[in-house]
């Protein structure tokens, strides 16, 4: 059976979790521009890739045919989100960001994590209803 019966006119861009992850991705992009040049191919690249993976996996999962495939991509998205938190911890430890800024990013992380877990639960229930 087709994965979700979603209306593809708005597609994944209508998902609240994707919208919040997009904001986070854009925030990470702005943040990494302030990192030292010595981090260009290290922390900067890792944080950019991980934050982009969060939204990309949600989008790719949305386009899959079966619920289980979508769930798996959402789990990958969740892993990338957690990777971002680790990279932000490194940025804190290296004093590229202060504790207040870290807590702001962590709050965004927690919001996305809750939305992502909710979306995974929704997809799991839909799969069981097939």
Give, region by region, the residue ranges found by the protein language model.
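Amphipathic alpha-helical assembly/interaction segments
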Residues: 1-130
């Amino acid at each position: 059976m087709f994965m979700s019966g979603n209306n593809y006119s708005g597609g994944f861009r209508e998902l609240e979790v994707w919208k919040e992850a997009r904001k986070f991705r854009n925030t990470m992009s702005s943040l990494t521009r302030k990192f030292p040049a010595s981090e260009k191919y290290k922390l900067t690249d890792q944080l950019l890739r991980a934050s982009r993976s969060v939204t990309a996996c949600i989008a790719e999962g949305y386009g899959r045919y079966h619920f289980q495939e979508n769930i798996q991509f959402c789990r990958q998205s969740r892993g990338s989100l957690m990777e971002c938190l680790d990279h932000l911890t490194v940025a804190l430890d290296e004093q590229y960001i202060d504790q207040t800024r870290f807590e702001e990013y962590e709050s965004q992380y927690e919001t996305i994590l809750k939305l992502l877990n909710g979306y995974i639960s929704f997809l799991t229930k839909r799969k069981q209803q097939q």
